Amino acid sequence: KEDIQMKTAIVTLPLHTNYGGLLQAYALKTALEDMGHEVTVLDLKDKMPSPKGLKAPFVYANRAMKRLLKGSAGPEVFREKRYRRELPILSAETSGFVDSYIRPRMIDSYEDVKKDEYEAFVVGSDQVWRPRYFSPIENAFLAFTKGWDVKRVAYAASFGTDQLEYEYEQLAECARLLDGFDGVSVRED
């Protein structure tokens, strides 16, 4: 058997209460380890950061306007507050699995990942390319690895919807980043 072991990082959705997402992260990690790779799953410490500084009032006002216009279909205005209140309850059943089997590396942001730490990055699986679930979306296309000599692979990545959730500038930037991938597999046709 050829020695193909690489230090590999998995970039996926936050590991907390999505049972399917947790199982997919575990399965991908296990499959890569079975192939001989040294695998780390990256997980953000603050999974839903609150808007900061001068930007915050505008973010909340924008959400409030959308909520007014769309009713219950609009975004929750202070969703970060509810998230922080409910997360300990919701993750009580999943945190043991995550800690025991996935054993993620907790990071404050993807900028914490240093240039020579990993030889490969795998994005997936699940709805990692959905801006509503992954912010900033450019990091789901490995923007933080720009200029690095690493392998970039998307595995079973999904947009999660047939409605475009990208701003034009995001779409153009993510398409440019995707050109730098060595392999791409997606769920959608």
Predicted features along the sequence, with ranges:
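Short, Lys/Arg-enriched N-terminal segments with co-localized hydrophobic residues
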Residues: 1-5
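Alpha-helix N-cap/helix-start capping motif
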Residues: 26, 188-189
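A short beta-strand/loop micro-motif in the catalytic core of glycosyltransferases
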Residues: 181-188
